[in-house]
Regions:
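Functionally critical loop-and-helix segments that line ligand-binding/catalytic clefts
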Residues: 17-41, 59-63, 193-251
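Glycine/tyrosine- and acidic-biased, solvent-exposed loop/turn segments at the edges of beta-strands
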Residues: 1-24
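Sec/Tat-exported extracytoplasmic proteins
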Residues: 14, 55, 79, 98-101, ...
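Surface-exposed, flexible loop/turn segments at secondary-structure boundaries
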Residues: 83, 112-114, 183, 208, ...
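Catalytic domains of cell-wall/extracellular-matrix polysaccharide-remodeling enzymes
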Residues: 135-211
Length: 251
C-alpha cells in the first residue's frame, strides 16, 4: 500500500496543498453565462477574436511568473438551470466559441427545488454535447439551508446521481461535478461513490491547489478577460499540455 505522496506545503502539521505558480504554459479556461452579457440594464457582446486572460483577480494571493496575458484553451457555457431556466445567450456563445476554435463544454446549474429527471431533460433538450466537446458539467452549489429544506444530503446526493446517470446515458460522456471546497469538506465524504467515480471541477479561491481528484480548478471569480465586459471566472486545468491532450481525447 503506497500512501500518495503529497507535494505541497504543510503548516503546523496541517497539509495546506500545493502552491501553484501561474505561468503562460499552464492550460487556462473560462466559464461564462448570461452574467457576461448583462450588467444592470446594459447588454454587452463578447469580442471573440480578442479573448486573452489579462488578470487573475484580487480575492486571493497568487504567485505569478511573468505578466498575465494568457491564451484561453477551453470555455464552459451555462445552458440551463433547474427545470425551466435557460441562458438566452447559450446557443450564440456556443456557436461563436466553436467557430473561433475553442474547446467547449456546457454546464447545468442544479436546483434543489425540482426533480432531477426534469432537470436532466431540460439540460439534454437545450444543450449541445457533441463528440468533440468537453464533458458536460453539473454545477452544484446549494446552501446548507437549501439542503436541509430538500430533506438533507441523502436526498441531494440521490438527485445528483439521477442527473449524472441520465446525462451520461444520453450523451455517452461521464459528467464532471462542479463543487466548492466547502462542499468537499462538509458533504462529499457522505457520497464515497461520487468522490471515487467522478472528476470534479472545484471552486477554491485560495493560494493552494485543492487536494481532490480534479479536472479543473476555478481559482478566481474576479478575473479579467480582454473582449469580455466585467469579471470572469478563471480556471486552470490540473496538468500540463500532454495531460490535457490526453484528457480531451479520452473524453
Amino acid at each position: 500500500y503506497h500512501k500518495q505522496l503529497r507535494a505541497g506545503e504543510w503548516k503546523n502539521n496541517v497539509y495546506k496543498g500545493e502552491r501553484l505558480v501561474y505561468r503562460s504554459d499552464r492550460i487556462y479556461g473560462i466559464d461564462i453565462s448570461k452574467h457576461q452579457h448583462v450588467k444592470g440594464k446594459k447588454k454587452y457582446g463578447i469580442n471573440w477574436s480578442k479573448l486573452r486572460i489579462v488578470h487573475l483577480g484580487n480575492i486571493s494571493k497568487k504567485t505569478i511568473s511573468g505578466s498575465v496575458n494568457y491564451p484561453i484553451s477551453f470555455i464552459y457555457i451555462k445552458s440551463t438551470e433547474g427545470s425551466s431556466i435557460l441562458n438566452p445567450y447559450y446557443k450564440k456563445d456556443y456557436a461563436a466559441a466553436k467557430a473561433h476554435g475553442y474547446k467547449v463544454g456546457t454546464y447545468h446549474f442544479f436546483s434543489t427545488l425540482t426533480p432531477a429527471n426534469k432537470q436532466a431533460s431540460q439540460f439534454l433538450k437545450h444543450s449541445f454535447v457533441r463528440s468533440n466537446d468537453l464533458p458536460p458539467v453539473l454545477d452544484v452549489e446549494p446552501t446548507h439551508e437549501q439542503i436541509k429544506k430538500m430533506g438533507g444530503t441523502g436526498v441531494l446526493f440521490a438527485r445528483m446521481r439521477t442527473w449524472l446517470r441520465l446525462v451520461e446515458r444520453a450523451t455517452g460522456k461521464k459528467p464532471i461535478l462542479y463543487i466548492s471546497q466547502t462542499f468537499v469538506n462538509r458533504y462529499l465524504s457522505q457520497a464515497p461513490d461520487l468522490k471515487k467515480n467522478y472528476q470534479v471541477w472545484i471552486a477554491r479561491y485560495g493560494e493552494y491547489k485543492p487536494d481532490v481528484k480534479m479536472a479543473y480548478w476555478q481559482l478566481c471569480p474576479d478575473g479579467k478577460v480582454a473582449g469580455i465586459q466585467g469579471y470572469v471566472d478563471i480556471n486552470v486545468f490540473n496538468g500540463y499540455h500532454d495531460a490535457y491532450s490526453q484528457f480531451v481525447s479520452s473524453h
